[in-house]
């Protein structure tokens, strides 16, 4: 589950700081806001929201309603000191989960993992990319930022992915991409360059050019 982007909206500095450290230690990427003022400006960059109900200004329920209107399908876990049934039911009607403070971080992590698996399924991650080999979709940074490949770019990328960590020569590409009647060797280079730009790999760390041989999609990228 590592690599998912989590937005924490919590005005209690002690709780917010603790949550941020715990989630980062588990491999999550965290954005922390102390109120809902600019939540909507970052919401498209995250995969899950952990939100306090009692916030300065608009409360968590109001902010969650605004998030849902965007139609992004981002799950929300509410945190609240209110333990009465009416508060719990209200939270569960608006968000996906409701946890009462104080809570056990281990329980929160388990609920988060289950929620992320339920909403997003299982993706393969390479550096900042999320790759779904079933739907043939690729996402940059967040699961709400799909890479918009052309048909030929998608075919090339997933050919590399299916043969990841192996070198594919230009002849391999020509044989696989039968619709490429133009056997100009540069045609492969052109498409690879466009793919790299779309996946933020201009340096060629993920899709590496092996001089004199071909290209390789690296699953382990050197830092």
From Swiss-Prot:
Q: What is its main location?
A: cytoplasm
Response regulatory domain sequence ranges: 5-116
Entry-linked SUPFAM superfamilies: C-terminal effector domain of the bipartite response regulators (SSF46894), CheY-like (SSF52172)
Tell me a GO cellular component.
Answer: cytosol
Location in the cell reads: Cytoplasm
Matching Gene3D superfamilies: 3.40.50.2300, Winged helix-like DNA-binding domain superfamily/Winged helix DNA-binding domain
Residues that bear 4-aspartylphosphate: 52
InterPro entries referenced in this protein's UniProt entry, alphabetically: CheY-like_superfamily, OmpR/PhoB-type_DNA-bd, Sig_transdc_resp-reg_C-effctor, Sig_transdc_resp-reg_receiver, WalR-like, WH-like_DNA-bd_sf
What is the protein named? Uncharacterized transcriptional regulatory protein YbdJ
Q: Which organism is it from?
A: Bacillus subtilis (strain 168)
